[in-house]
Amino acid sequence: MNLIPRVALFADTFHEINGAANFLRRLTSYAKDNGHPLLCIRSGCETRVSNDGSVRYLDLKRIRASIPLDGDFRYDPLLWRKRALVKRTLKEFGADVIHLTGLNDISQFGFVHAHFMKIPAVATWHTNTHEYAAER
């Protein structure tokens, strides 16, 4: 029995400059540095799968017409067209748990796949919404 769970991280933010993205980059670095298996599903410039040590990345390219939310942070209502790729990648990885990081398009993928694939999920929230909204 392997005591290290295989985690699929659905990262709504990753490349952007914000506290949540910084935390998620540090989390993936920790997994890589310690040889922990991690699948990180995130936005990217192109849709592709890549590996970096024990970390596998599934980058999903958003359409140009995706909805801007804040800075570089966007919502792609058509991202669902990639659901078969996400499901296949999750199955190949063999996730024990899904980690959701927000309410945006990529975490929505995670929530739906966790439900239908019967994979336990944990959700974290990295933004104090009231303070964040007050500053905008």
List the model feature ranges, each with a label.
Residues V86-S107, P120-T124:
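Short N-terminal targeting/anchoring amphipathic segment
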Residues A65-D70, T124-R136:
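Acceptor-binding helix/loop patch of EC 2.4 sugar-transfer enzymes
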Residues S54-R88:
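A short, charged, and often flexible helix/loop element on the N-terminal side
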